[in-house]
Amino acid sequence: MESQYFLKIDAYAHISPPKYTDVLRKEYPGFYNQILGTCPPLFDMPERFRIMDLYPGVVQVLTVGPVPPLEAFADPEKSVDLAKLANDEMAELVAKYRDRFVAAIALLPMNNMDAAVEEAKRAIKDLGFRGIYVHSTINGKPLDSPEFLPLYERMSQYNLPIYIHPWRGDDVAEYPTEKTSKYMIASVFGWPYETTAAMTRLVFSGILEKYPNLKVVTHHCGGMVPYYEQRILQHYGSHERSGRASYPKDLPKSPIEYYKMFYNDTAIHGNTPALMLAYHFWGADHMVFGADMPLGDHYFGFRSYRQTINAIEAMDITGAEKKKIFADNALRLLRLPV
């Protein structure tokens, strides 16, 4: 069906810039052959635009993906070079195709924190980027590790968001008697868990309290959090009352209040009941349109865009709230001049 809401800002669209992709193809062929080589719209702009043209009004905020985290395959020096290459090229694409790409989110060398803070500054101040992109775990370290605090402080000062993308490789087995994950469990079910774990570390570490201006955007609609709202309330509450709580009890807000501070995209492939669950937890103001384009879809985003747009249209909410999800929230969150 044709949407009545013309402007739709895909706030979490994935891309692998062509020059950056060429480097990965030559220097990291395993990653290229596994994912990038099977998904042309990541780096083939005409093919990408062909899909976008099927959905009038769709524009994109660019995020690099979906190879494993930069720090997982590049050393601290090389990751700086690759991050700069990707960010420079995304800036060129935004400048060249302003009617397609309204902004970009910076890739950072997270295994080199001094350089990551400087690259965030360069990307935002010099290139005009509207946020930064990190994974749910940094080479096995949680996001509340003290070494990452300077980056959070800087982003709080910029008043621009941190995008969290889940990561759990197939080398992380579900059972200690096995060496690898099977049946795509790591990504299909592990990624929502990793998102939830990262959110929880940010909540209970006090980072969201320490930096109240910090804004965090999750992928795939906030992982498990909205589904487990009552479990969060009951278990954390009962453990605190019984004296068995293993988390700080001096935070001024309840845990659920901190979870409600996150922003979340709609990239769950068109499930209206699940979107309504997220809506009841976060409200329309903390949801942004996203379809995981061009991933998770054998048609490289064609099906996911259709499913996601139709699912939002079918939500039992007001037209003004749908408009917020499709565009207004991204305009506000990213401070876009569209």
Residue ranges: model-predicted function:
Residues 1-11, 16-59, 88-95, 118-122, ...:
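Mid-to-C-terminal alpha-helical segments outside catalytic/metal-binding sites
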Residues 15, 65, 110, 166-172, ...:
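Short glycine-enriched loops at secondary-structure junctions
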Residues 32-41, 47-74, 101-109, 130-134:
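Divalent metal-dependent hydrolysis catalytic cores, especially in the metallo-beta-lactamase
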Residues 33-42, 80-81, 186-195, 243-246, ...:
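A short acidic, glycine-rich active-site loop
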Residues 38-46, 84, 88, 141-152:
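Aromatic- and glycine-enriched glycan-recognition loops and surfaces
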Residues 64, 77-80, 116-128, 217, ...:
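Short, electropositive alpha-helical surface patch
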Residues 66-80, 114, 183-184:
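Surface-exposed, active-site-proximal loop segments in enzymatic domains
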Residues 124-288:
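Catalytic pocket-lining loop regions of alpha/beta-barrel enzymes
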